Amino acid sequence: MVVNDTVADMLTRIRNANLARHQIVQVPATKVTRNMALVLKEEGFVHNFEQMGEGIETHLMISLKYNGKNRQPVITALKRISKPGLRVYANHKELPRVLGGLGIAIISTSQGVMTDRQARHDGLGGEILCYIW
């Protein structure tokens, strides 16, 4: 299946897997989705991820994280900000704080994909891909 917006597709798959309390979610692998998965792992939103397959059939297997006996998802919500029809950019001074610092914004900068905190620290702006909390 051809997907135009791989970031939105990734966020939707993670959101649906969280609601269904799935342990693992499969996402098509691109440079951006790999880097976003790495940021999610570094920030503690997912356990781990692994790349499977070769060539055009490459995909990521992302292991989701849950808390407690009731298996509450660590990821409460995901929101796509910059869309193909309306790109949203910000310089390092304008980068948003998600829920007063409780969540993260994933930013695509000239130095790669990173969190809003890292981009602010490095003095970088870029495209605001999504908010996660």
Swiss-Prot record:
One of its GO terms (molecular function) is rRNA binding. This is Small ribosomal subunit protein uS8c. It holds the Pfam family Ribosomal_S8. Its main location: plastid. Belongs to the universal ribosomal protein uS8 family. It comes from the Eukaryota. One of its GO terms (biological process) is translation. Part of the 30S ribosomal subunit. Keywords: Chloroplast, Plastid, Ribonucleoprotein, Ribosomal protein, RNA-binding, rRNA-binding. One of the primary rRNA binding proteins, it binds directly to 16S rRNA central domain where it helps coordinate assembly of the platform of the 30S subunit. GO terms for cellular component: chloroplast; ribonucleoprotein complex; ribosome. It is found in: Plastid, Chloroplast.
